[in-house]
Regions:
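N-terminal glycine-rich phosphate-binding loop and ensuing alpha1 helix
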Residues: 2-49
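A conserved hydrophobic position in a structured secondary element of the catalytic/binding core
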Residues: 50-51, 102, 179, 230
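Hydrophobic/aromatic residues located in beta-strands of well-ordered beta-sheets
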Residues: 5, 46-48, 92, 123, ...
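Conserved core of the sugar-phosphate nucleotidyltransferase
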Residues: 102-190, 196
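Short phosphate-binding loop-to-helix
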Residues: 47, 53-112
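Short, high-confidence coil segments that cap the C-terminus of an alpha-helix
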Residues: 43, 89, 118-120, 215
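Conserved alpha/beta core of the MobA/IspD/sugar-nucleotide pyrophosphorylase nucleotidyltransferase superfamily
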Residues: 166-251
Length: 251
């Protein structure tokens, strides 16, 4: 099985323009993400997928495989789909370009189920919410699955709502995905024909396009507490963590 890791990277972010190139201890953020991916032995190849020449040039300067893609994509999954049309593989793993501290074992968790079950089409990760504030935070997608870990719904609301009991462990989405080529083809063709699916559009959660259309998304629980860089303040947190790890000799 040929497995490719793909890191979508946009320069034009509404909250933090240019963040893939933000400096972290002398290297652009995208370099840190890429190097975490290289530690995943199951990944045969890793690419950054971008529509920006500045990111392309930074990748080339830092020895990073890069694929130029259209600037018309509405989602990162659409960008992965274009890569799939250009580079053949049996499995594509979507790794977010704004999580430079993402652990290799977390990435592996999205891959391993495919090696044990060849009927799987899509995997996604989830982690238990430890901070109660995140349960009511609309920026945090909550995951609801059945007993087999198949996704039933994802929402930015508090769900399930604790009307009768608060004895429930809430989970949030970790944005690492595994896609078979056929699943990516469906996602892209649906988008070209219909645009975003109804619930996907309302919640603004990409994976709902699959769930709304009957695809089974296998969720895997991980113990992940990585820091996503959405703002300059997040970047400062990551810089501090990296600096501390370098001093401790753990990087």
């Amino acid at each position: 099985m040929k497995i490719i890791g793909v890191i979508p990277a946009r320069y034009k972010s509404s909250r933090f323009p240019g963040k893939p190139l933000a400096d972290i201890c002398g290297k652009p953020m995208i370099w840190w993400v890429y190097n975490q991916c290289l530690k995943v032995k199951e990944l045969d190849e890793v690419y950054v997928a971008t529509d920006d020449v500045k990111i392309e040039e930074a990748c080339k300067q830092n020895g990073i495989n890069v694929v130029m893609t259209s600037d018309q994509h509405k989602t990162g999954t659409d960008r992965i789909g274009e890569v799939a049309r250009k580079i053949e593989a049996d499995l594509y793993v979507n790794i977010q370009g704004d999580e430079p501290l993402l652990e290799p074992e977390t990435i592996r968790a999205a891959i391993l189920p495919f090696l044990e079950n060849d009927t799987l089409q899509i995997t996604n990760l989830m982690t238990k919410i430890k901070d109660p504030v995140e349960v009511v935070n609309f920026t945090v997608p909550k995951v609801i699955t059945n007993k087999e870990g198949i996704g039933i719904y994802l929402t930015r609301s508090t769900a399930p709502y604790p009307k009768g009991s608060i004895d429930y462990a809430y989970y949030k989405q970790v944005c690492v995905y595994g896609f078979k080529p056929e699943a990516l083809q469906f996602y892209c063709e649906y988008g070209q024909t219909y645009g975003k699916a109804k619930i996907e559009s309302i919640e603004d959660i990409e994976i709902l396009r699959f769930i709304e259309n009957g695809y089974k998304v296998q969720y895997i629980e991980v113990d992940s507490d990585t820091v996503a860089v959405d703002t300059p303040n997040d970047l400062e947190k990551v810089r501090k963590i990296v600096e501390d790890r370098k001093k401790a000799g753990t990087i």
